[in-house]
Amino acid sequence: MSSEEKIEETQQQQQESVPVKELLLKVQLPSFFNVGDDYLTIPSSYEENIADLKQALNIIVLCRNLTNYSILIKGIDIIENFGELITFEQIISHFELDKQEEQEEQGQEREISELKIVIKEKSYNLASIYEQISRFREVIGLHYIDRLSNDIGSCGGVSKFNGIQLDDIKPKEAKKEESTEKEQQEKEELSISKEEVSKISDFAKQFISDSFDGNDFTKLTKFDDINGKVKIPIKSLTISQWSPVPPFQQAKGDLLYLSLQTLEHETFNITCHFSGFFVNKSSTINFNPTIKINEKGKFNKSYLLYDLVCQLSPLFSKTIAENEINLSDSTKYPETYLLPGNSFPAYPWLVNEKDLQNVPDLSRSQLSSLINGVDGADYIKDWNNDIQSIKELPTTTVQERIIREKLIQKSLFEFNKTATETAINIIKGNIPPLNPDESSDKFIYLRNGIFYSSGTSTVNGFENTGGEEASRYVASKDLTGIKLINRHDIRGISSLVTCIVDYMGKRVVCQAPVPGILDTPVITSPTTDAEGKNEAEEPESEPVEKVVYGLSSDGSRILEDKSFEEPLKQIGDFFHLKPHKVQLSSSSSGDDVKTESNLVVSKDTKGLKGTDGRKYVIDLYRTTPRDIEFIEQHFKLDDDHQETSYPHGEALIRHEAVNEWWRRKVAVLFKKETEQLEKEGKLLDKNQDQDQENKPQIAIPTDQVVFNPDAFSSDNENEIEQDREEVREISKFIKEKLIEEFLDEIKDQVIPFDGQQLTDVLHRSGINMRYLGYVAERLVVKKEKHLVDLEELIKENEAKAEKKREEEKEKEEKEATESEDKKEKKEDKEDAEKEEAEAEEEVPTKATYQLTLANYSTLHRIIIQEMISRSVKHILRNLTKSLPSYLISTAIAHFHNCLFGGAINPTPKVDFIDEIYKNFCSKSDLESFIKLTHDDVIKLVSKEVFSRFRYKLSSNWINTIQLPQLFREIAFKYGIQWKSQNYPFTKEEFELQNNQNKETPTQIQIIETKSSKKSKKKTQTQVITEKSIQRSSIFIADDIIGFIPIIKDSSYKSTIVEEIYSNARSHLVQGNKEMGMALFNELLAINESIYGKVNPETAKFYNLVAQVYQELGYDIEAALIGRKAVILCERSCGFDSYDTITAYMNSAYYESSNEQYLNSLKLYKEAMNTWSLVYGKDHPTLINTLTNLSESLLKIKAYDSALELLQEALEITKKLNGEISEITGFIYYRIANIVVTLNKFKESKELFDKAYDIFMKLLGPDDSMTKQVAKYVSSVGLYVEYLKRQQQQQQQETQKKSKTKTKAAPVNNIATTSTSTTKNGKKSKKNNTPPQSNPEIANQSIDEILRFIEGKPSGSKKSNKKK
């Protein structure tokens, strides 16, 4: 089903769905809550279920500690009898609550609005005791500490938003509907106090490039510390030393014993009983689990653990109340501290040491006992069955689809989390393999229901196409295929739940295995053949083949189970695969093996039958064709090219490229069929009626637009040539179409900030990253051609201008011979004709203001940086794959010294490796990185770049690259977390920093081996000594905080959210604003329920909704949601990700729309600081941003600040685009307008001259923009001359009348000093009359100027009338 069909189906489901019936739940709580006869009221609906009620109870403060209870309706336990997924509508129907008693016989129904529910506590068992303890830990905040301690990285989910200190969102002042002409003209001028304007102007001065914090790592990593203000309300709560409960106490109802230490430093021993919790008489040395009663007969017992601790510790309740106050005071946005739901948080590559903390908690080591069940069996899950069962849930209604998507996302994340944690332990050597006799790259593991293998375990299948490199590559492509099948929701065939973990240079592929695939086949009772031999006793029995469709495990047969054809055909249709026959050449017998019928997928895609009865598909990497053009050109197996060959021959084309090729081919077929019908006269005009039944259907033969996935996958000469040509056509399509179109479009696009954004942009365009070198080369060609074209254009326009000047000169000479009266009449006539012509039609300017040159240069720089950082990642992987984990930090630091510190120390030494460490690894492993020098690393990187990207770096590339940005990219690619400090990347910075650090040198501990001199026998002892070191290069091993795993998983973007979003947008487009906004509000809740609050998808969706709100004029709502989007992007995508930068920019725009300009400037400043870290201080986007900011400042008449921003934008654009560019000319023109407002007419004349010169050269003398600027040049020039003459005249009069003061005309504004004389109603042409210039040119916005230039009417001006 196509996406359009799914959207239509969703719309139909929403239209068919009954309006939501509201329901009020009146919940009676257990008596120990002491609420009397009062009911707890919870708003709900008929569609919600018991699980939703339990979730609501978990949130409500009064009853959030309740975990072990029954839900009774009419005295019947609902969960026990019906389960948690039963809806209230089903409950009402089952109990016939909707029928009136007096009308039961007639069967008449009524809609009830209230439902009474009774919550009854249950007796505890050990499992529910564990659940109660877990809930207690969560309520008091220990789950925050648990996450920090057990996280896969440091400081996950940081944010800086609260540190910006924005003012509260305020509604705009209501504007009158009716306004006078003067108000209409001044609508852009806002009523803001002088004090606020002064604050805004002062803050705007920070927008010069020198003030950006891009290279100040310490400033940029000052993250919010919200959780640090939360105190733990107890000292500790642990499972007591007296646990487990002995048999003689089990019969008395004891379940577990706890030890509690309060903030008052008291220790209590607690018995967990089936009836609740109570303090017992045990101590550290005496066991007595009976209830403790003091001399007054008082004892402490409660059904809830939380209530018991409240009784025992007054500071407990007080601290929890203070925590709530501290959280609310610290931030207005709960998104800042909420824990991520169905995703990992973003882990920063720079970590502030002050944020690293470890809180003491004795119970943390006992968590596995609490959360994995009473016998630990809950840790082992049947992931495959759980997730496949969820996928098989019904999807007939929108609500069912939402529930299904929610469960899928939750289960997939739990799988990814478990798999990642185990993979890290595997890489660290903490888990033994199942096959220890094999080589380490062949190790396999089976742990907690997940099968683990290295990314190179299938290397034997790719001996001829790259071995290990090919194996790693196809593992990622297999995951991509799984992800697409999951998203498309193909039924009848199941894919494996998969994720890939790269950690410290090693890869682990994690999969939930096909049920039964790892089982050893059971041999049945032996049978006897005709000769009396026992068949089961044959010494060499063949292994049981688990594959039933596709290539067999040993590659000798092709299996064709007919039951797999139909479900696999769905996959073939989705990926546009061509049914085809396959022929193999058998190595043993020499006979060819052929398929009997067509395979609907690649032979390498295998079908298996699980013991659960499901059909499974594996090895989905061959769902796109091989990039045969690239492979043939760059992958060479011979010895001569081995050093320079591309690493593997399994290069595959991206699905986006195949889909684009398919769409274009289908469009050609559609056009052809349409033309054929038109030719036959079967297509009638739109105005003619035609029966729907007789209406001609255009049948597009899409089965013609397919490809053979096995083409070029072997040396078989029997492959059909047409199949090969189709694959070759798709391969050529990338270079000939996709890359060229991408480069043509990039002139108008926002250039990526970093490598991750570049990767996403190229992938969306269907371009593989191996083409980076080719794209870089094409950019150079495009840039050179642009410069040549620009030079020719300038020459052409200069020639036109010269010709026009000559024509005007001739005309002036001719007019000089005419009489003055004739000349004046002729001028009046020409002016009238000119004004009439301009009024009738004004040709829009040809100016596009494209940042072509800047975009080409910027993109080229990012591509070079990306190629280098990716190459370094592969070098580091090879360098560290055989090193023990404790030496990897040392190796990484030394490599970075060699790479970045060439100017500081070209031959850095690896110092301070403890002697004892050296005994744990081989000498060859140590020497693999110890002997590296700067020159070695530069050569390694250059070689790797050429090998992987077919691009030759310049010999001095290290001097042309931006080192801080490359440093960041490498950290992301490999997964390194560095200590946040300002690293010196130049010799000057290094020497300055070393001189500053002489007083506080770095202290490190070294284990040294020393010989004893006192003893006669020479004995060696190891001693720990602390040494002060002075850095000899940039980095040391201690600068590395840790490593984080790079995780690729099979989770996908929910389709139901996208479909409802498209439906909501369509309602808005059709003018149904109320329905559209209702759907958007509902969508926010749906999105959060599926993904969780802190999730990248939720963050991006908040951005979308804020944009929609702003478009509809809901500025306050847009500003609020925009702020939340920033926080969620920071915490889930990364504080310096391009998503976060975009969110900051959007949020700044929403604040500006809400007329809170100081807030807007603060957000823009944070965005610029971040992208100066990510890219540098000269990204092309900065030009537009500064220009737009100047517009905002002009609205509040902060002219000086607006001028400073435009001057900064001018310097950047001159650097990036050159002096002669449209955008440079436009900024000159804009600055000149502001300078006029500041009464600096001489300076404005110079600026207008520069703008005119640029536009004349680029647009020609006849362009409307050139003419417009020419008018300003003439107007301001004449006025400057007028002022000069007036000043001279005043001086002469002063000299003549030295005793008399003469009043001079004020020169504060062009409008007040300009006068005009008329003769017979006509303008006088006398030289001593100042020109009539436009007094509002400085107050016009850029959009208004452009509208005026393009001939469009402006709302703030009257149209010119012919005099």
Swiss-Prot record:
One of its GO terms (cellular component) is cytoplasm. Residues 172-191, 521-544, 799-844, 1291-1363 are annotated as: Disordered. It comes from the Eukaryota. Its main location: cytoplasm. PROSITE patterns: CLU, TPR_REGION. Residues 1330-1342 have a biased composition (Polar residues). Keywords: Cytoplasm, Repeat, TPR repeat. GO terms for biological process: intracellular distribution of mitochondria; mitochondrion organization. Residues 361-631 form the Clu domain. The keyword Cytoplasm applies. The keyword Ribosomal protein does not apply. InterPro entries: CLU-central (IPR033646), CLU_dom (IPR025697), CLU_N (IPR028275), CLU_prot (IPR027523), GSKIP_dom_sf (IPR023231), TPR-like_helical_dom_sf (IPR011990), TPR_rpt (IPR019734). Residues 799-832 have a biased composition (Basic and acidic residues). CDD domains: CLU-central. GO terms for molecular function: mRNA binding. Residues 833-842 have a biased composition (Acidic residues). It is found in: Cytoplasm. TPR repeats lie at residues 29-63, 120-154, 283-316, 548-581, 1057-1090, 1141-1174, 1183-1216, 1225-1258. Belongs to the CLU family. May associate with the eukaryotic translation initiation factor 3 (eIF-3) complex. mRNA-binding protein involved in proper cytoplasmic distribution of mitochondria. This is Clustered mitochondria protein homolog. It comes from Candida albicans (strain SC5314 / ATCC MYA-2876).
